[in-house]
């Protein structure tokens, strides 16, 4: 550990002249895991970006260059999504106490409108409009009002922002570009991709998905769902962890949509972590305009169960794209805790393992250090200093098992069996840890409940990116 610390110190020293020169020239240095400065997508990430899609009827999107950050003159940073008809809409927001102005504005609007009559969402990147006081709330309101003018519907637009905290928006620049954003709206794949690019900050690739589905009562109707999300850092659940917009042309009631979204978010965006930080701006919103027709979906029906399942699977895949783009990440890691006495205990254990810096750095170093996994498991349910370990009956060391599960379909590598260490085949462990995707499986031997989290490793690059973020 001391040697690793020294290596980190010398790497830091070597980087300083490069960082200082880059700042003098008004740019940040190139980074191995960051998006290239010309806006192109790294070769290793292109496989996650769709080249086509099937998008919901009646929705149009655009991505427009504003220059919210003074250094940005080439990349779109204002996204607009609009429905041709008013939607039922719902959103889940951050639980961070310092909630950003757009979060406050959008939450209040949805409450006033009772999740109905929402037609647009406008999103800027480059500035979070968080911790900006009354002026920030006024700016968020102005953004919504300008979008409302374009649709001709008052109080029909929610707002999202992402970027640096504690700075005011260049609101006049944004407002001047809203008509252009509206004029550029379209329903093609390129339009959706442009919007997905516009909400990115430190993301190395735009995160966009679409698919079709059917409902039991309308087997002849093809419904569509599409979503875009952004996030690469400051990702840890205590609501939704990032920005996400999902739209469907299925007809969903205003009572059913919020409950379906909450269920989906708890099992997707609330089950990922990159660095354990919960943002001030986290928002995931869901819009349903009913443009595809068919019977309206209400709670307590087979249609509702089917839609909720589709939404949950879709949201999970969308959330996993965020983990695959974790700042500086080289691995996508599934942490699965099974045989738990309760789902809550399984979630807390999986979450603790997934955000442990020691686990994440070991994975980056391709080190089969299962002791760190066991350590995180052991303290995961201790909520207060001095709490007796007898107060944590959900974990029994003599029943606990830990394994690596390869993603290539080969046999699991058992590391701990019933609390006893296995003789680890280091060569086999090295093969598994060379893979981009891997799974950590913890069996508690206490019941039949389980939980899954998705995370990534920690590399030197994570520190470089976040040490230089504001430039």
From Swiss-Prot:
Any one biological process term the GO annotation gives: L-arginine biosynthetic process
Disulfide bonds listed in the record: none
Transit peptide extent on chain: 1-33
Site for Involved in the stabilization of negative charge on the oxyanion by the formation of the oxyanion hole, residues: 162-163
Enzyme class: transferase
Posttranslational modification: The alpha and beta chains are autoproteolytically processed from a single precursor protein within the mitochondrion.
Keywords: Acyltransferase, Amino-acid biosynthesis, Arginine biosynthesis, Autocatalytic cleavage, Mitochondrion, Multifunctional enzyme, Transferase, Transit peptide
Compartments reported by the entry: Mitochondrion matrix
Active-site residue list: 241 (nucleophile)
EC code: 2.3.1.35, 2.3.1.1
Catalytic activity: N(2)-acetyl-L-ornithine + L-glutamate = N-acetyl-L-glutamate + L-ornithine; L-glutamate + acetyl-CoA = N-acetyl-L-glutamate + CoA + H(+)
Residues with site note (Cleavage): 240-241
An MF annotation (GO) of this entry: glutamate N-acetyltransferase activity
Pathway linked to the protein: Amino-acid biosynthesis; L-arginine biosynthesis; L-ornithine and N-acetyl-L-glutamate from L-glutamate and N(2)-acetyl-L-ornithine (cyclic): step 1/1; Amino-acid biosynthesis; L-arginine biosynthesis; N(2)-acetyl-L-ornithine from L-glutamate: step 1/4
Broad class of the protein's primary localization: mitochondrion
Residues annotated to bind substrate: 201, 230, 241, 327, 466, 471
Cellular component aspect of the GO annotation: mitochondrial matrix
PANTHER family attached to this UniProt entry: ARGININE BIOSYNTHESIS BIFUNCTIONAL PROTEIN ARGJ, ARGININE BIOSYNTHESIS BIFUNCTIONAL PROTEIN ARGJ, MITOCHONDRIAL
Subunit structure: Heterodimer of an alpha and a beta chain.
NCBIfam families, per the entry: ArgJ (TIGR00120), PRK05388.1 (NF003802)
Biological role stated in the UniProt entry: Catalyzes two activities which are involved in the cyclic version of arginine biosynthesis: the synthesis of acetylglutamate from glutamate and acetyl-CoA, and of ornithine by transacetylation between acetylornithine and glutamate.
Family statement: Belongs to the ArgJ family.
Protein name: Arginine biosynthesis bifunctional protein ArgJ, mitochondrial
């Amino acid at each position: 550990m001391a040697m690793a610390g020294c290596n980190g110190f010398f790497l830091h020293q070597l980087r300083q002249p490069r960082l200082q020169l880059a700042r003098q020239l008004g740019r940040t240095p190139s980074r191995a895991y960051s998006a290239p400065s010309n806006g192109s997508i790294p070769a290793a990430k292109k496989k996650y970006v769709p080249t086509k899609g099937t998008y919901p009827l009646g929705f149009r999107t655009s991505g427009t260059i504003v220059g919210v950050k003074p250094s940005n003159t080439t990349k779109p940073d204002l996204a607009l999504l609009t429905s041709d008809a008013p939607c039922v809409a719902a959103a889940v927001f951050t639980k961070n106490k310092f909630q950003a102005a757009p979060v406050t504005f959008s939450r209040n609007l949805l409450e006033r409108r009772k999740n109905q009559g929402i037609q647009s969402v406008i999103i800027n990147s480059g500035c979070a409009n968080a911790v900006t006081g009354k002026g920030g709330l006024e700016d968020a309101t102005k953004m919504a009002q300008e979008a409302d003018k374009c649709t001709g519907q008052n109080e029909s637009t929610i707002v999202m922002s992402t970027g640096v905290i504690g700075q005011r928006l260049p609101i006049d620049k944004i407002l001047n570009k809203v008509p252009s954003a509206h004029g550029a709206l379209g329903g093609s794949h390129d339009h959706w991709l442009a919007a997905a690019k516009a909400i990115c900050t430190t993301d190395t690739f735009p995160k966009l998905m679409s698919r079709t589905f059917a409902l039991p009562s309308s087997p002849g109707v093809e419904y569509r769902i599409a979503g875009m999300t952004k996030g690469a850092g400051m990702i840890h659940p205590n609501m939704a962890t990032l920005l996400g917009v999902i739209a469907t042309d299925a007809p969903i009631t205003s009572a059913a949509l919020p409950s379906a979204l909450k269920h989906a978010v708890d099992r997707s965006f609330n089950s990922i972590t990159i660095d354990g930080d919960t943002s001030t701006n986290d928002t995931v919103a869901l819009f349903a305009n009913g443009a595809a027709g068919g019977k309206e979906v209400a709670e307590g029906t087979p249609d509702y169960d089917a839609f909720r399942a589709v939404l949950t699977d879709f949201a999970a895949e969308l959330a996993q794209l965020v983990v695959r783009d974790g700042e500086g990440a080289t691995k996508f890691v599934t942490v699965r805790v099974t045989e738990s006495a309760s789902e809550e205990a399984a979630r807390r254990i999986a979450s603790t393992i997934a955000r442990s810096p020691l686990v994440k750095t070991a994975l980056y170093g391709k080190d089969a250090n299962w002791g760190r996994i066991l350590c995180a498991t052991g303290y995961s349910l201790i909520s207060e200093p001095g709490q007796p370990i007898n107060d944590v009956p959900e974990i029994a060391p003599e029943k606990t098992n830990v394994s690596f599960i390869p993603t290539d379909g080969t046999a699991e590598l058992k590391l701990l069996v019933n609390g006893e260490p296995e003789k680890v085949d280091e060569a086999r462990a090295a093969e598994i840890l060379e893979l981009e995707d891997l799974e950590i499986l913890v069996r508690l031997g206490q019941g039949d409940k389980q939980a899954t989290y998705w995370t990534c490793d920690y590399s030197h690059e994570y520190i470089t990116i976040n040490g230089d973020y504001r430039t």
